[in-house]
Protein backbone atom coordinates (compact mmCIF):
# COMPACT_ATOMS: atom_id res chain seq x y z
CA UNK A 1 0.00 0.00 0.00
CA UNK A 2 1.13 3.54 -0.68
CA UNK A 3 2.77 5.47 2.15
CA UNK A 4 2.73 9.03 0.82
CA UNK A 5 -0.42 11.10 0.90
CA UNK A 6 -0.12 11.92 -2.80
CA UNK A 7 0.35 8.24 -3.71
CA UNK A 8 -2.75 7.31 -1.69
CA UNK A 9 -4.73 9.96 -3.57
CA UNK A 10 -3.43 8.79 -6.95
CA UNK A 11 -4.41 5.22 -6.11
CA UNK A 12 -7.89 6.33 -5.11
CA UNK A 13 -8.24 8.32 -8.33
CA UNK A 14 -7.04 5.43 -10.49
CA UNK A 15 -9.58 3.09 -8.89
CA UNK A 16 -12.38 5.60 -9.55
CA UNK A 17 -11.28 6.07 -13.17
CA UNK A 18 -11.01 2.33 -13.74
CA UNK A 19 -14.58 1.92 -12.52
CA UNK A 20 -15.82 4.68 -14.81
CA UNK A 21 -13.95 3.25 -17.79
CA UNK A 22 -15.27 -0.26 -17.09
CA UNK A 23 -18.85 1.08 -17.00
CA UNK A 24 -18.30 2.97 -20.27
CA UNK A 25 -16.88 -0.13 -21.99
CA UNK A 26 -19.86 -2.17 -20.76
CA UNK A 27 -22.27 0.40 -22.23
CA UNK A 28 -20.35 0.21 -25.53
CA UNK A 29 -20.54 -3.59 -25.63
CA UNK A 30 -24.27 -3.59 -24.88
CA UNK A 31 -24.97 -0.95 -27.54
CA UNK A 32 -23.02 -2.93 -30.15
CA UNK A 33 -24.87 -6.10 -29.16
CA UNK A 34 -28.21 -4.37 -29.74
CA UNK A 35 -27.16 -3.32 -33.24
CA UNK A 36 -25.90 -6.82 -34.07
CA UNK A 37 -29.15 -8.37 -32.81
CA UNK A 38 -31.20 -6.01 -34.99
CA UNK A 39 -28.99 -6.83 -37.98
CA UNK A 40 -29.44 -10.59 -37.55
CA UNK A 41 -33.19 -9.99 -37.27
CA UNK A 42 -33.04 -8.12 -40.62
CA UNK A 43 -35.00 -5.22 -39.12
CA UNK A 44 -33.64 -2.17 -40.94
CA UNK A 45 -35.59 0.40 -38.88
CA UNK A 46 -34.64 -1.08 -35.52
CA UNK A 47 -31.03 -1.50 -36.64
CA UNK A 48 -30.92 2.15 -37.69
CA UNK A 49 -32.22 3.33 -34.31
CA UNK A 50 -29.78 1.06 -32.49
CA UNK A 51 -26.95 2.36 -34.69
CA UNK A 52 -27.73 5.97 -33.75
CA UNK A 53 -27.72 5.04 -30.05
CA UNK A 54 -24.51 3.02 -30.41
CA UNK A 55 -22.81 5.87 -32.27
CA UNK A 56 -23.64 8.20 -29.40
CA UNK A 57 -22.34 5.76 -26.78
CA UNK A 58 -19.14 5.10 -28.73
CA UNK A 59 -18.47 8.80 -29.31
CA UNK A 60 -18.98 9.59 -25.64
CA UNK A 61 -16.67 6.77 -24.58
CA UNK A 62 -13.99 8.06 -26.95
CA UNK A 63 -14.36 11.67 -25.85
CA UNK A 64 -14.09 10.70 -22.18
CA UNK A 65 -10.95 8.66 -22.85
CA UNK A 66 -12.42 5.23 -22.11
CA UNK A 67 -11.36 4.10 -25.58
CA UNK A 68 -9.19 5.45 -28.38
CA UNK A 69 -11.04 7.70 -30.82
CA UNK A 70 -9.82 5.74 -33.84
CA UNK A 71 -11.13 2.50 -32.33
CA UNK A 72 -14.51 4.15 -31.79
CA UNK A 73 -14.52 5.46 -35.37
CA UNK A 74 -13.64 2.00 -36.70
CA UNK A 75 -16.45 0.36 -34.74
CA UNK A 76 -18.99 2.99 -35.85
CA UNK A 77 -17.90 2.57 -39.47
CA UNK A 78 -18.19 -1.21 -39.40
CA UNK A 79 -21.58 -1.12 -37.69
CA UNK A 80 -22.89 1.41 -40.23
CA UNK A 81 -21.62 -0.73 -43.09
CA UNK A 82 -23.34 -3.78 -41.61
CA UNK A 83 -26.63 -1.91 -41.16
CA UNK A 84 -26.48 -0.60 -44.73
CA UNK A 85 -25.88 -4.12 -46.03
CA UNK A 86 -29.31 -5.23 -44.74
CA UNK A 87 -30.96 -3.58 -47.75
CA UNK A 88 -28.58 -5.23 -50.20
CA UNK A 89 -29.50 -8.73 -49.06
Swiss-Prot record:
Example of a GO biological process term: translation
Pfam families per the UniProt record, alphabetical:
Ribosomal_S20p
Cellular component aspect of the GO annotation = cytosol; small ribosomal subunit
Tell me which UniProt keywords the record has, alphabetically.
Answer: Ribonucleoprotein, Ribosomal protein, RNA-binding, rRNA-binding
UniProt-annotated stretches for the region Disordered: 1-26
Write out the GO MF terms. Answer: small ribosomal subunit rRNA binding; structural constituent of ribosome
- Stretches of Basic residues bias are at 1-12
Q: Which family does it belong to?
A: Belongs to the bacterial ribosomal protein bS20 family.
The role this protein plays is: Binds directly to 16S ribosomal RNA.
Query: What is the recorded name of this protein?
Result: Small ribosomal subunit protein bS20
| Native organism | Desulfovibrio desulfuricans (strain ATCC 27774 / DSM 6949 / MB)
Instruction: Output the lineage of the source organism.
Output: Bacteria, Pseudomonadati, Thermodesulfobacteriota, Desulfovibrionia, Desulfovibrionales
Amino acid sequence: MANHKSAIKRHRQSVERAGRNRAARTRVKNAIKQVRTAITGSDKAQAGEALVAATSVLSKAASKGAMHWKKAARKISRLARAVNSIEAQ
